[in-house]
């Protein structure tokens, strides 16, 4: 097959590589000429994706995968076009369709009959049918269901382990017609293989959803569930702090019962998915008060963690605070919706002298965000762990000379290593005065 992948980002490029490794001819489209050049040189544009640096070079050198900035070089004659372009939310938490709209228009201008168009980017319910079907028809002059088919098939992978996740989870496909959905199912059955899983209600593989809207909602629901669950865990944690008990023991006890699946509380919920997709869900169901309350609770956690430090120390004004971890999660060089931004803002508002450390970022990269760089071993009054990098698990007071308080926002350090120095976690209960 000839496959075009629109969007050569942290999901799109591994997808393109996977298809090419399966023997298909793949052309990737991206608006960034630097990314395109690196891909064509066989160089991984964003390190950190398992196996990508190994898989990409032979595909680029053989021509099985190439990248371009020109839709005209990728779309005409493609059997399938896979859209993996970011959809973000604006400052008022509304979906910002501009990038996806532009990509869809550019793709549609070169669409040829017989093509399957699959949207893998997470979209609000109804967007595939109500927004992109008519837009493609308007620009291309073709008719969906006659000249081409559109399906929604959400990516369900995590950056850093895309290749493994493609086989791990069922591939959901929802079409705009029965025949169109069958077209989508046929494509994904041809390009994917799946792990055997005894825990699923039916065999792992491509799962038809009976319509694009069901597939759209499934992706939003699974991620919104996680945000709501974390929001509940964070509420439990705040109450545990107020009454002086350790919420981790409570959650461990609850989850020993098979119907309880409480997530872990923490200093922040970040990344491209969990903080964003509940907002996309709310775009279609604005009266979902449970969802909006959980989102608000999670968004407040960075400020809450700083407030606990301030309460224990009396004030943070003038104190040297080292914020450990800029990324939204450990081991991944990505700051999308990271808690670092909220924590820095709250610390500056409290009058603290803030510096940031992250093992994945050089000093100049941290400076580009407007942050002073902190280096382990430099004097500090307070340290706050924001990202669960492996390098922080074995931290001891000697790594942070003069530290009076550690706020372990991810509960990854050893309490025994901090005997004699105040250490608190989110939901860890009361702590001695510093």
Question: Where on the chain are the PLM-derived regions?
Answer:
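Structural/interface elements that position substrates and couple domains in central-metabolism enzymes
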Residues: 1-434
């Amino acid at each position: 097959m000839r496959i075009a992948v629109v969007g050569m980002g942290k999901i799109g490029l591994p997808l393109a590589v996977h298809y090419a490794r399966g023997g298909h001819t793949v052309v990737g489209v991206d608006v960034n000429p630097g990314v395109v050049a690196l891909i064509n040189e066989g160089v991984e544009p964003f390190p950190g994706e398992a196996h990508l640096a190994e898989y990409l070079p032979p595909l680029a050198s053989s021509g099985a995968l190439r990248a371009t900035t020109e839709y005209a070089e990728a779309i005409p004659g493609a059997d399938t076009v896979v859209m993996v372009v970011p959809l973000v939310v604006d400052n008022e938490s509304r979906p910002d369709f501009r990038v996806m709209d532009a990509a869809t228009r550019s793709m549609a201008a070169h669409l040829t009959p017989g093509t399957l168009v699959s949207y893998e980017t997470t979209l609000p319910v109804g967007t595939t049918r109500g927004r992109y079907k008519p837009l493609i028809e308007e620009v291309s002059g073709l008719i969906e269901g006659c000249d081409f088919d559109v399906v929604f098939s959400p990516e369900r992978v995590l950056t850093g382990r895309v290749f493994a996740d493609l086989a791990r989870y069922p591939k959901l496909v929802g079409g705009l017609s029965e025949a169109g959905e069958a077209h989508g199912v046929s494509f994904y059955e041809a390009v994917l293989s799946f792990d055997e899983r005894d825990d699923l209600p039916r065999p792992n593989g491509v799962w038809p959803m009976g319509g694009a809207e069901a597939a759209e909602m499934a992706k939003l629901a699974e991620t919104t569930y996680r945000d709501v669950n974390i929001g509940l865990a964070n509420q439990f944690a705040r109450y545990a702090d107020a009454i002086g008990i350790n919420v981790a023991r409570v959650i461990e006890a609850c989850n020993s019962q098979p119907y309880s699946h409480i997530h872990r509380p923490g200093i922040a919920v970040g990344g491209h998915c969990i903080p964003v997709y509940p907002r996309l869900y709310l775009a279609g169901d604005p009266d979902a008060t449970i969802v909006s309350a959980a989102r608000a609770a999670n968004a407040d956690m960075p400020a809450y963690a700083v407030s606990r430090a301030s309460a224990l120390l009396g004030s943070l004004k003038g104190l040297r605070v080292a914020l450990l971890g800029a990324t939204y999660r450990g081991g991944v060089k990505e700051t999308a919706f990271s808690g670092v931004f909220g924590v820095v803002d709250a610390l500056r508002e409290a009058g603290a002298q803030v510096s940031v450390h992250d093992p994945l970022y050089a000093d100049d990269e941290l400076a580009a965000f407007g942050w002073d760089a902190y280096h382990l071993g430099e004097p500090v009054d307070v340290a706050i762990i924001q990202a669960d990098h492996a390098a922080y698990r074995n931290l001891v007071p000697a790594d942070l000379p003069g530290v009076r308080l550690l706020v372990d926002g991810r509960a990854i350090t050893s309490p025994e290593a901090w005997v004699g120095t105040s250490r608190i976690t989110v939901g860890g209960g009361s702590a001695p005065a510093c």
